[in-house]
Regions:
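C-terminal accessory nucleic-acid interaction domains of nucleic acid-metabolism proteins
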Residues: 1-36, 47, 51, 93, ...
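Short beta-strand
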Residues: 57-60, 165-171, 212-216
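Signature for HUH/AEP ssDNA processing cores
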Residues: 97-170, 181-183, 187-189, 299
Length: 299
């Protein structure tokens, strides 16, 4: 592929992609231009899930075989048409990117951003999340069948508490179980409920599940991570590409797919996601309609 600048047009903007032939992935070879086109293709499905959420940007200037890094503050060279927000932090504030239009997603890919990560709260109130997420992260040697079973268990418990449940394979190793919330409770309150649910799961299956943060202490168990439910924490965005072989994509799925033995956490890639959306649409298209008030924690 020529190294001359090429453009990707989305809406009214034409985004120049420098070094479009740069291979960001080598197994198989996937270029920066292919990455940019991926985000253009998925933008209609992706934007409702990321709009107005501050982003942490995982970039790989030399491709995923090289050193990656996270960007939280907006670099000075970013164009002024990109929407940003000021995020308060201890001792000051950060200016962070908001992916509120397709052109921003494409521009970020052109800046070697492979994976955007999003807050669980939106700018309307950054201290009150509209998502509760349990991230099921298996240790090496744990079967994905066990991950699927644990995700279904988490869903049953959340529904028993009065919440709706959605699922996403992360494109890496695990599954996110997600309950949409009305943004009324602060992070600490939401975290307490998620933690209590996770503790009950671990109590019922201590040989399969753990809340141990240190990887060396987990053994061959599934880590139930609820610690992303906190101010300034972030999770991989739906339809975000992961920095792994084959360029797998974090894919929202129908809840029933958690019972499919063919399901894998990296089943969909930049080369197959378009077909999935064409045939099945966005599995989270109605997630916002199911947002509910956080239930009272029973003691």
């Amino acid at each position: 592929m020529s190294d001359a600048v090429q453009s990707v047009t989305v809406g009214r903007r034409s985004i120049p992609i420098s070094h479009p032939g740069k291979q960001l992935f080598t197994s198989p070879a996937i270029s920066k231009l292919t990455l940019a086109r991926h985000y253009a293709r998925v933008s209609e499905a992706m934007l409702p899930h990321v709009r107005d959420r501050p982003l942490a940007l995982e970039a790989f200037p030399q491709g995923i075989a090289g050193q990656g890094f996270f960007m939280k503050s907006v670099p000075a060279h970013f164009p002024d048409w990109i929407t940003t927000t000021e995020v308060p932090k201890r001792g000051g504030s950060l200016i962070q990117v908001l992916a509120n239009d397709p052109a921003t997603l494409v521009y970020l890919a052109g800046q070697n951003v492979v994976t955007p990560h999003v807050w669980l709260a939106r700018t309307i109130d950054l201290r009150r999340p509209d998502r509760l997420i349990i991230d099921l992260d298996p240790s090496p040697g744990v079967s994905f069948a066990d991950v699927r079973a644990a995700a279904r268990d988490a869903g049953e418990r959340l529904r028993a508490a009065g919440l709706a449940t959605f699922a996403m394979v992360t494109g890496s190793r695990g599954v996110h179980v997600v309950s949409p919330l009305r943004p009324e409770a602060e992070f600490a309150t939401v975290h307490r409920l998620a933690r209590a649910l996770a503790e009950a799961m671990v109590s019922d299956a201590p040989n399969r599940l753990t809340l141990e943060w240190h990887r060396s202490e987990r053994g061959r168990r599934i880590y139930l991570d609820v610690n992303r439910i906190a101010y300034a924490q972030h999770v991989v965005a739906p339809y975000g590409v992961r920095a792994r072989s084959r360029a797998p994509v974090a894919m929202p799925i129908a809840w029933e797919e958690l019972s499919d033995p063919r399901l894998r956490p990296d089943r969909w890639t930049v080369r197959t996601v378009a077909g999935r959306l064409e045939s099945d649409g966005d599995a989270w298209a109605r997630i916002a309609r199911h947002a509910r008030r956080l239930p009272t924690l029973r003691t």
